[in-house]
């Protein structure tokens, strides 16, 4: 299976998926930490992929997603966005709705 197929499978098999640097318990950058904090506040469970230990995903996902940065939040197979968008949605109090409705 090539890396794009792996990415597609990860996205399709997880309702809420976060591509991030590190893990939810040990984020390796401030953007990933802020995104994890917002997601945890929603109370929804989510899967994650550590792009630091998956260099092929780190290299290929930005082109596949047409989104250049990490973290990337995917909900129900759709890219929601990165840290800035997640933070903005969260500050409006709409993150739980965005996560559940997608």
Model-assigned labels for residue ranges:
Residues 8-45:
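Local sequence-structure signature of Cys/Sec-based thiol-disulfide redox active-site neighborhoods
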Residues 75-102:
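Non-catalytic, surface beta->alpha helical segment in thiol-disulfide oxidoreductase systems
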Residues 38, 48, 60, 72, ...:
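Residue-level recognition of specific faces of alpha-helices
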Residues 1-9:
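Short N-terminal or domain-adjacent regulatory/targeting segments
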Residues 44-58, 68:
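Thiol-based oxidoreductase modules, predominantly thioredoxin-like and allied folds used
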Residues 63-69:
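Thiol/disulfide oxidoreductase modules built on the thioredoxin-like
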